[in-house]
Amino acid sequence: MKVWMAILISILCWQSSAWAVCPAWSPARAQEEISRLQQQIKQWDDDYWKEGKSEVEDGVYDQLSARLTQWQRCFGNETRDVMMPPLNGAVMHPVAHTGVRKMADKNALSLWMRERSDLWVQPKVDGVAVTLVYRDGKLNKAISRGNGLKGEDWTQKVRLISAVPQTVSGPLANSTLQGEIFLKRKGHIQQQMGGINARAKVAGLMMRQGNSDTLNSLAVFVWAWPDGPHLMTDRLKDLATAGFTLTQTYTRAVKNADEVAHVRNEWWKAKLPFVTDGVVVRAAKEPESRHWLPGQAEWLVAWKYQPVAQVAEVKAIQFAVGKSGKISVVASLAPVMLDDKKIQRVNIGSVRRWQEWDIAPGDQILVSLAGQGIPRIDDVVWRGAERTKPTPPENRFNSLTCYFASDVCQEQFISRLVWLGSKQVLGLDGIGEAGWRALHQTHRFEHIFSWLLLTPEQLQNTPGIAKSKSAQLWHQFNLARQQPFTRWVMAMGIPLTRAALNASDERSWSQLLFSTEQFWQQLPGTGSGRARQVIEWKENAQIKKLGSWLSAQQITGFEP
């Protein structure tokens, strides 16, 4: 009983986190948002089940369907499962399709496995479910999953799939099998290639008329033999003898969740003959088939792979001004997990790029990880009914503004502090954007180098800066005084690469001020345009004032 309660709590906790916080909508808006998404999903359902085509990626469909369910629960507007296919199948299944309950994580799976024995793991093949009925050794009927009780008659289609045995013998001569019709692949690596919309492609091939040749691109993975042999090994052997060899090849005995996790990770990275979206763990002991009902299977569960892309709700649009004055746009998101990373923000790019994407708070966007684990936007998959986009700040900033603090300069000023503290410039370890904001808010810096005047006492009494960290920070600030002249010039934002600056052999502020445009132009990677920028930079009043201030502080290279 305690174990079952733990499982229930684990599932509920996972569901709570997955459903997230309910939107702060009025009843009228909730009705509108739910109705719009419901209509769209119904249209996708009709396209998928009636015409065999898909206008949306499988993963996006699944996640938006889950989002609709969440909204319905939030506002007491639950209806039938939107992912349930239309009830237009007329052929009764000899044995009902139960479906499979999904485990939230390894811990939930471990709790489920603890009360069971003789367990086996199989890949969760991504395709469409089917019933195969053999009578007197011949394929008698093939039925689509439908609603689990009734489905479409797919017999003629399945007879054209060469990979499906049309005749069997022995124990299978009069049998009912359940499995997955899938798209045959050569060396499909799920980790690298993703789902390729396999489910929709299979459904399309099965729904279309007159496509007998293309049906040979399909095969079947049998995952259940209701009322079959009691021993799983006997089941697998008989299936393989009959021609269903994949089931034996990809079914393994497991004792615990660690072993399942190992196999799951192996298949995630391995070359497989089909697309998968996780694994299924099943007990060899099953009830008699007459007890099978949709949604009632307690002898098997699924542990799906984490999607390579997640649908995330945009909570806010924020604007940031970089050290060069360029305005960038960032979307704050309701947290989603990607590859064990919690994603709460994604960079959209420039204001123009944001306007092209047409993203507003409340929209649903598809997010994945680019190189080095950086979040990126793949698509806007759903736009809200009520869309209010913020007004971007005026583009009044450039590479020569905001060396000195002011109300309008707040963001670019902070960006300059973050830049000068980075490893490639002054190397101030232990302080980032949050730390700079705390220091500036408390001590009201005059300019980007005002931190050099902070005392140990001031740092220790700064809200947001831990006292244990303040001494280390003061030490870092003092060490910065010993940084080479070129590092300080970089901190001042000189429009040159480090390589060009080092090649200039400039060792003092006075020497740099007297260098001509022709001198800068001859440096590697520095053309006439960049040389003019350097001249404009060194003649800027704010830059000259900073140079004089650093001279008064006896910073290396700035001494009189």
Swiss-Prot record:
Keywords: DNA damage, DNA repair, DNA replication, Ligase, NAD. Its EC number is 6.5.1.2. It holds the Pfam family DNA_ligase_OB. Catalyzes the formation of phosphodiester linkages between 5'-phosphoryl and 3'-hydroxyl groups in double-stranded DNA using NAD as a coenzyme and as the energy source for the reaction. Gene3D superfamilies: DNA ligase/mRNA capping enzyme, Helix hairpin bin, Nucleic acid-binding proteins. GO terms for biological process: DNA repair; DNA replication. It catalyses: NAD(+) + (deoxyribonucleotide)n-3'-hydroxyl + 5'-phospho-(deoxyribonucleotide)m = (deoxyribonucleotide)n+m + AMP + beta-nicotinamide D-nucleotide. It comes from the Bacteria. The active site is at K124 (n6-amp-lysine intermediate). Transmembrane segments: none annotated. Belongs to the NAD-dependent DNA ligase family. LigB subfamily. This is DNA ligase B. Signal peptide: none annotated. The keyword NAD applies. HAMAP family: DNA_ligase_B. GO terms for molecular function: DNA ligase (NAD+) activity. It is an enzyme of class 6 (ligase). It comes from Escherichia coli O6:H1 (strain CFT073 / ATCC 700928 / UPEC).
